[in-house]
C-alpha cells in the first residue's frame, strides 16, 4: 500500500500532464491537510488552474481517469475527491466565499513537478 505522499506526488505529476502549459496549483485541504483524518477520510484536493470558469468541466474526465489510474496502481489505498477551480475566479472571490477562504488559509500546496 502506498503512502499519501506518493499518491499526492503522482496526482500532481498527472495533473501537470493533463493541463499541459496551463499554470496549475494542487492544494490538499480538509482532514488530511489539518492532520485530523481517520481510516475513512477522503483525500480532498483542489486544482487551481489558470483557465476561465467555463472550462473547469472540460478537464473533469481526464482528472477522474487519472484517479482511476492511481487507484489501479496502488490498489484503492485512498479515496481522492478532486475539485477543479478557475484560478482567476478563485483570486477574485477567495476573501468572500467561505470555502475559498478556508482553502487559502488551511490548504497545503503540493509541488507540481
Give the ranges of each region predicted by the language model.
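Catalytic core of pol beta-like nucleotidyltransferases
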Residues: 1-25, 34-39, 50-113
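Conserved H-loop
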Residues: 31
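Short beta-strand->loop micro-motif that forms the acidic, two-metal-ion catalytic signature
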Residues: 44-48
Amino acid at each position: 500500500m502506498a503512502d499519501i505522499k506518493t499518491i499526492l506526488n503522482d496526482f500532481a505529476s498527472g495533473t501537470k500532464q493533463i493541463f499541459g502549459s496551463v499554470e496549475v496549483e494542487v492544494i490538499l485541504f480538509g482532514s488530511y491537510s489539518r492532520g485530523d483524518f481517520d481510516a475513512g477520510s477522503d483525500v480532498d484536493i483542489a486544482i487551481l488552474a489558470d483557465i476561465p470558469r467555463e472550462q473547469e468541466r472540460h478537464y473533469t474526465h481526464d482528472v477522474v481517469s487519472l484517479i482511476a489510474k492511481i487507484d489501479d496502481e496502488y490498489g484503492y489505498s485512498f479515496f481522492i475527491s478532486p475539485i477543479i477551480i478557475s484560478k482567476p475566479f478563485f483570486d477574485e472571490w477567495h476573501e468572500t466565499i467561505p470555502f475559498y477562504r478556508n482553502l487559502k488559509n488551511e490548504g497545503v500546496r503540493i509541488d507540481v513537478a
